[in-house]
Regions:
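Tandem repeat scaffolds
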Residues: 2-9, 14-169
Length: 169
């Protein structure tokens, strides 16, 4: 009798443990959404973000001088007030990014997509913009004129001419 009671208790305990294990596994299987990263005010000089998916991340006032962001997915990213001097953004997707007051001095924006980005007070002195797509980018008129002086090429992804996307005369 005691032996049967012991076996029954063991069987019930084993079932409870199995249910707990299955529950934990099921909870772990539920996909959690990717959270945007926060790099605000970080010093990221020479950092390598090439090819990374960083959608909706924030680099507000970050120092990304000489960093590699080539072919990165930067859609919706905030680079507000960021230092991107001499950064490599070749082939990066900056669609709908916030670039206001960012410094792209001597940055490589070859074949980058900046469609719909807000870049009103961004600085682009000496930037390479061959094949960059500036469709619907909000720029100051003097910056637009400056970029039109060096604009050339066609973006290989969107098929748009850089000069046309800047609405150059």
């Amino acid at each position: 009798m005691i032996r049967q009671l012991y076996q029954l208790s063991y069987a019930v305990l084993l079932k409870i443990v199995m249910l707990v294990v299955i529950g934990v596994v099921m909870l772990g299987a539920i996909a959690t959404p990717a959270l945007a990263d926060d790099y605000n005010k970080e010093t990221l000089v020479n950092a390598d973000f090439s090819g990374r998916v960083l959608t909706d991340s924030s680099f507000t006032k970050a120092n990304l001088r000489s960093s590699n962001l080539s072919h990165a997915d930067l859609r919706g990213v905030s680079f507000f007030g960021a230092n991107l001097e001499t950064a490599n953004l070749e082939g990066a997707n900056l669609t709908n990014a916030t670039l206001d007051t960012a410094r792209f001095t001597r940055a490589n924006l070859t074949n980058a997509i900046l469609e719909g980005a807000f870049a009103f007070n961004a600085k682009f002195e000496g930037a390479v913009i061959d094949g960059a797509d500036f469709t619907d980018v909000l720029l100051r008129q003097d910056v637009q004129n400056q970029l039109c002086k060096v604009a050339q090429g066609t973006n290989p992804t969107t098929g748009r001419d850089t000069r046309e996307t800047l609405m150059c005369p």
